[in-house]
Amino acid sequence: MTKPVASYELDEKRFLTLLGKLIGETENLQNRPPALIPIEDNAGRHVIEALTPYLKANGGVLELEQVHCDPVNYPKRGNIIIEYPGTSKGTSSPKTISFVGSHLDVVPADKTAWDRNPFQLIIEGDKLYGRGTTDCLGHVALLTDLFIQLATEKPALKHSIFAVFIVSEENDEIPGIGVDALDHSGKMNPCKNGPVYWVDSADSQPTIGTGGAQTWNLTAHGKNMHSAMPYRTVNSVELVNEALAEIQRRFYIDFKPHPKEAEYKFDCSSTMKPTLWKPIAGSYNTIPGESTICGDIRLTPFYDMKEMRAKVEGYIKDINANITELRNRGPYSKYDVPASEGVEPVKGSVSIEWLGEASAGVACKLDSDGYKALGKATSEILGSLTPVATCGTLPLVRDLQDSGFDIQITGFGKEETYHADNEYALLSDFKNAIKILSRTIDLLEKN
């Protein structure tokens, strides 16, 4: 007799076996070009091997496609699309439930900073240590186990169930090979017929909002000069600091807390702040002619990223037009030095460089059937529903929402270990996770 979907439980041995194989590949899954370009097929082969007995080609029910979006340049970086077909497939009103976003690449791990081997699954009680346990190979193993159970039990579902494991999530320097390319090519179009759960978050509660991110370099231009003669130049270190302070002042006026942030319970409003200095080649007794502060902007999804960039560029244009109105640092600190006998004129200026494409934040639709089912399932299994919103960024998710997908977000690793040394996840969380996901499917089937 077929077991009800809502009764599925994690096959612990099978899950840990697959996860161990995936973590064992992570040294070659690290993503930081150009030095570290992942070979996601090294992980994908273990997923395919686990699912092979259940594929239609072998007498099973699952359909699987490995998609290399740029096979010429990246022949070993394949996305994996898995489908458990529902009874509505091929009808005029197909229904789908999709689990997307669990990725096959990982962030780099420094062995010397870890207490354990990051490239090996190490089990200590409930804790599963290794790079990718939380982000995001644990989710890959979890969903693979879910599909094996579907293929074994063969429930008659109206909805087709999809999983999409993606490449190149942890770094966007090589575009056009991951979920963005799958979307643009139409490979994900069937997933528009129902909720899409982005399974790459943490702490087992729904994430209902994320922030957008834009990195920047702010550079002040002056002129190199001996530090004994500050009156003859524009000190770029002073200028870049004062300019940034003025830009931040204006930013927080224009991008103040949005009323919807309270509804979504964002833990932080939009921010603009410095995070790095570019190294300055010089000495203690040289005033540098150029200084650069680096940082990022985090924008809640209720503001537009393009409008934000235009605003900031406007601040800088105004600052340059009125450079002498910035606060100076004493009687010999000036941002416009006029010509005089023996002194060449120097006028300071600032410029901003936007690094890469901005990732926009997303506000999930709280009135959708997809969210309601996930919320109810989470509450039933964990005993409470406490959705979160964060200014952390999930690349590409907003693009999918803008393409017409009903995006919902969840995940079952540990937030505190994301991208961290000694990353771990809890086996007990994954045991609950399969119950949450299978109950979500069950609720949508009954809707």
Curated annotation (Swiss-Prot):
Domain of life per record: Eukaryota
Cofactor(s) it depends on: Zn(2+); Co(2+)
Record text on cofactor binding: Binds 2 Zn(2+) or Co(2+) ions per subunit.
Single GO biological process annotation from the record: L-arginine biosynthetic process
Gene: argE
Binding site for Zn(2+) 1: H103, D135
Native organism: Dictyostelium discoideum (Social amoeba)
Keyword GTP-binding attached: no
Subunit structure: Homodimer.
Reactions that this protein is recorded to catalyse: N(2)-acetyl-L-ornithine + H2O = L-ornithine + acetate
Pathway recorded for this protein: Amino-acid biosynthesis; L-arginine biosynthesis; L-ornithine from N(2)-acetyl-L-ornithine (linear): step 1/1
UniProt-listed Enzyme Commission number(s): 3.5.1.16
Family of this protein: Belongs to the peptidase M20A family. ArgE subfamily.
Coiled coil region boundaries: none
Protein name: Acetylornithine deacetylase
Enzyme superclass (EC): hydrolase
GO cellular component, one term: phagocytic vesicle
